[in-house]
A protein has these predicted regions:
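Hydrophobic/aromatic residues located in beta-strands of well-ordered beta-sheets
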Residues: 99, 124-126, 151, 208
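Conserved, mostly hydrophobic/aromatic
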Residues: 21, 69, 101, 143, ...
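Anion (oxyanion) recognition and catalysis
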Residues: 92-95, 147, 195, 202
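Auxiliary Fe-S-binding modules of radical SAM enzymes
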Residues: 3-12, 165-293
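Conserved Radical SAM active-site core
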Residues: 2-124, 133-136, 162-173, 289-293
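Histidine/lysine/aspartate-rich catalytic loop segments that bind and position anionic ligands
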Residues: 128-132, 144-175, 180
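A general structural detector for well-ordered alpha-helical segments in enzyme core domains, enriched
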Residues: 83-90, 139-142, 193-197
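Active-site-proximal loop/turn and secondary-structure-junction residues that shape catalytic pockets
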Residues: 73, 105-107, 130-132, 157-159, ...
Length: 293
């Protein structure tokens, strides 16, 4: 998952709760480091990351950037209840930054919202994981019933066919992301599933991004093994599935509550290699970390 260059992990570790968790990449990577992914703890230096500033006194995360939250956990994990109020406060302070929340636990969300939530904060992009049809039918109706101004779906790991046409017609879903499974015991992703899901998004004018094929990819009846994420991303891009739907507009404001002019917002920058990345359509831009391609 490399579609945004900034990640904020206020806590680490998770409890598996559905089929998509079976081969969790976080558990795999922790095991490679001789750690236990089931051990849940609040991060120390990383917890306040969105508030950290550079030597010039400017925020490290610029106005208009988009940050993925809890990519090694779940923001609505029950074990994280003692820390969530503080995390909400950080997002409240950075009303100029978009926070991308993704959960497999939408049933817990309403009880976890801050008291001043109202109809939702405009800088929160709330997404639910729909790894198969069962979870789509379970989680999307809950998503629709929650007070968020921006909503999306992520079919990853994409382990079975998913149809969301009936949900897209409601007009609440602004973006759909899908990607195959990686690392430990990856289950196959079938290109037919991707094409079908993409067509539903095109018909509804909803942005669709196929970020990676996964390790095991089935196309035209042939089974392919793609051993690294860079290759998977390039193949996803090459498939031509990515589609830019209707624009998503976040009304970001400064510390005083005033709208931030468009010219003052962060503009993603990309390198040549980014042009063949499956995630470019929804990416926060290249951070020049040197880790990809």
């Amino acid at each position: 998952m490399s579609f945004l260059h900034d990640i904020w992990n206020p806590w680490h570790g998770c409890v598996k709760c559905s089929e998509g968790c079976q081969n969790c990449y976080m558990y795999f990577l922790d095991r490679m480091r001789d750690q236990n992914g089931a051990e849940i703890y609040k991060t120390k230096s990383g917890f306040s990351y969105p508030l950290q500033k550079d030597r010039t006194g400017h925020y490290k995360i610029q106005s208009g950037e988009q940050i993925r939250v809890c990519m090694t956990s779940d923001f609505f994990l029950e074990e994280a209840d003692p820390w969530r109020v503080e995390a909400w406060d950080i997002m409240r302070q950075r009303s100029d930054v978009v926070f991308f929340l993704l959960t497999k636990r939408p049933q817990r969300v309403r009880e976890c919202l801050p008291p001043d939530w109202g109809s939702g904060w405009d800088n929160i992009f709330f997404n639910v994981t729909c790894e198969n049809q069962r979870r789509a039918d379970e989680r999307i109706p809950i998503l629709f019933d929650l007070p968020f101004k921006h909503k999306g779906i992520m079919c990853a790991p994409f382990i079975g066919p998913v149809s969301i046409r009936q949900y897209l017609s409601a007009g609440q879903i602004e973006q759909v992301i899908c990607g195959g499974e990686n690392y430990d015991g990856a289950r196959p992703c079938n290109f037919d599933w991707v094409k079908s899901l993409q067509q539903e998004c095109v018909d509804a004018n909803v942005t669709f991004c196929f970020i990676e094929t996964g390790t095991v990819f089935i196309k035209d009846g042939r089974r392919y093994h793609l051993p690294n994420k860079q290759l998977q991303s390039r193949m996803a891009c090459k498939s031509g599935m990515n589609f830019q739907g209707r624009p998503i507009h976040f009304d970001l404001v400064d510390d005083w509550g005033y709208p931030i002019p468009q010219e003052d917002l962060y503009v993603p920058h990309f390198r040549a290699n980014c042009e063949t990345c499956g995630s470019k359509l929804i990416c926060n831009g290249c951070s020049n970390c040197g880790k990809c391609l």
